[in-house]
Amino acid sequence: MPSRFTKTRKHRGHVSAGKGRIGKHRKHPGGRGMAGGQHHHRINMDKYHPGYFGKVGMRYFHKQQAHFWKPVLNLDKLWTLIPEDKRDQYLKSASKETAPVIDTLAAGYGKILGKGRIPNVPVIVKARFVSKLAEEKIRAAGGVVELIA
């Protein structure tokens, strides 16, 4: 029956302790860890980890992330920014005097996209960026788009 661990005590007095003759069973012949990735282990790196070494593209120095902040909101979700208790009230009285003001920036959205439909009720939408299609759909419903900084 094979044993789980080698019995080191039994190897006492036997020079190579079951590891062969002179020079066999050396410590770390290929180096430790990722050593030799660009040298003697190159075939493995190229085959199983393509693209591990090297660079691609250009660096963007002093990139200001705030300039690229633009979370999007589609038109079909626009009315979810109005509280539910007031939503029915606005939908019933579809007049320009009582049009709801939707501030998308305060809700955490940077741009409005034109996917989906909106009810045929005038709304005043305040946003930083609005796509062409979204603006057309809001205007078709009798609404107004205000661009804010």
UniProtKB/Swiss-Prot annotation:
GO MF term (any one): RNA binding
Gene3D superfamilies: 3.100.10.10
Gene Ontology CC: cytoplasm; cytosol; cytosolic large ribosomal subunit; nucleus
Cell compartment(s), UniProt: Cytoplasm
Signal peptide stretch: none
Chain ranges for the short sequence motif Nuclear localization signal as given in the UniProt record: 7-13, 24-30
Segments crossing the lipid bilayer: none
Keyword field: Cytoplasm, Isopeptide bond, Ribonucleoprotein, Ribosomal protein, Ubl conjugation
Biased composition regions of type Basic residues, renumbered to the chain: 1-14, 21-30
Effect of Q38E: Confers resistance to cycloheximide, an inhibitor of polypeptide elongation
Cross-link annotation Glycyl lysine isopeptide (Lys-Gly) (interchain with G-Cter in ubiquitin), location: K96
Assembly information from the UniProt record: Component of the large ribosomal subunit (LSU). Mature yeast ribosomes consist of a small (40S) and a large (60S) subunit. The 40S small subunit contains 1 molecule of ribosomal RNA (18S rRNA) and 33 different proteins (encoded by 57 genes). The large 60S subunit contains 3 rRNA molecules (25S, 5.8S and 5S rRNA) and 46 different proteins (encoded by 81 genes).
Family: Belongs to the universal ribosomal protein uL15 family.
Role this protein plays: Component of the ribosome, a large ribonucleoprotein complex responsible for the synthesis of proteins in the cell. The small ribosomal subunit (SSU) binds messenger RNAs (mRNAs) and translates the encoded message by selecting cognate aminoacyl-transfer RNA (tRNA) molecules. The large subunit (LSU) contains the ribosomal catalytic site termed the peptidyl transferase center (PTC), which catalyzes the formation of peptide bonds, thereby polymerizing the amino acids delivered by tRNAs into a polypeptide chain.
UniProt-recorded name of the protein: Large ribosomal subunit protein uL15
Organism this protein belongs to: Saccharomyces cerevisiae (strain ATCC 204508 / S288c) (Baker's yeast)
